[in-house]
Amino acid sequence: MKNLANFKVAVKTREYLIQAIFQMLFSDQKASQIINQFKNEHKNKKLDFTLFTNSLNSIQNNRRRIESILISLNIKDSNIEIIDKSIMYFAINEMIRGDLDRPVVIDESLRLSKKFSSPESYKFINASLDKYLKTHK
């Protein structure tokens, strides 16, 4: 595994971002509510709240587009866990935004999957993102 020590704050921020996306999808809360909650609950932690806020707002704004991409990849709510869907939302949104190189997005998504999801989910995430890259260049 790559040394992520130099990117500790960004890595930790993305971990919290996955939790926030999960909350958004599970409870259908608005990004602003979740952002305020996370800022209050985690104000003493070393997190990049600008990255967190920009990403979560972008996901909310791109939600229909992300959903349509998931449908085009044959990913339906009935066959995906919410945590895996959260990771896919993160990855697709990052690729739409273009702030991170695509290989970095894929590596980070696989790392997040291994941390938060079932042991084999990273294979599903990897295959889905590979399919996305082949169809959405």
Predicted feature residues:
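N-terminal interaction/assembly modules
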Residues: M1-K115, P119-Y122, N126-K137
